[in-house]
């Protein structure tokens, strides 16, 4: 009989289960308290109960655990310095959506060579998240794959659904199941209505198919996530200006949703020129000084060294520099955070 299925796949290996990985890298009581408390603080900021600003900042993607931990250690110092004005969360992105093809992130390809040792990638991701949280730094990530969230979601304080997946029904269902607040990016064309629709969908209860912690495919009923919000990331043109934010708030108001949002300084808002993140920062700081309460948070891409680099086989990588989108360097990061804290001071 002719085969009609699995004609374009080849088995590689079995995937470790979330339960097995959690046994190797368990959440300690201290980390559990830290994650729970940071989620609550973020929720209060997004609801307007806390006047401080949520600052999600870090490398475009994680590829080197040593450099990531050095960045986290430096970020913890900034957290301590500005904790009365800012809730600083480290961007720890392990999955990269690609427009066509390219490196898909630490989980998929931890060796950066197309070997796709996913079990090892999952282990590295969980190990790093534990270490960063043990430092006292909350973590943020994009939830892209429908399976990998089960391996790391217990260590995440804030999640994002990307511009390419905000319209996806299964990602909206996943967001309704997640235990952390979730931001939805506007579409790559700049359309914010799809993010508002995603917020509404994620607030509802859904039947959701997912592997459980033991790898058994399971039918879950979600209770809905009340902490969905828009991430203004720009599109064909930036959308961080005051009139753009007012228009987004009008749409939120139309559906009785909280008029609080997050502004992404990178991507479409910096027109893929990383140093323009500083210009976006100046504009947002002025809006905050002018009394804007809609801006609950910001996102920025920064690392130890400015810019980006290509992966070239046989050649060493520059330590602390991005291998995906270009990032601000550490000195600019310190300046950006200081400016944000100074602007938020006017809210008090």
Curated annotation (Swiss-Prot):
Its EC number is 2.5.1.54. Keywords: Amino-acid biosynthesis, Aromatic amino acid biosynthesis, Transferase. It comes from the Bacteria. InterPro entries: Aldolase_TIM (IPR013785), DAHP1/KDSA (IPR006218), DAHP_synth_1 (IPR006219). GO terms for biological process: amino acid biosynthetic process; aromatic amino acid family biosynthetic process; chorismate biosynthetic process. It catalyses: D-erythrose 4-phosphate + phosphoenolpyruvate + H2O = 7-phospho-2-dehydro-3-deoxy-D-arabino-heptonate + phosphate. Stereospecific condensation of phosphoenolpyruvate (PEP) and D-erythrose-4-phosphate (E4P) giving rise to 3-deoxy-D-arabino-heptulosonate-7-phosphate (DAHP). NCBIfam families: aroFGH (TIGR00034), PRK12755.1 (NF009395), PRK12756.1 (NF009396). Belongs to the class-I DAHP synthase family. This is Phospho-2-dehydro-3-deoxyheptonate aldolase, Trp-sensitive. It comes from Escherichia coli O157:H7.
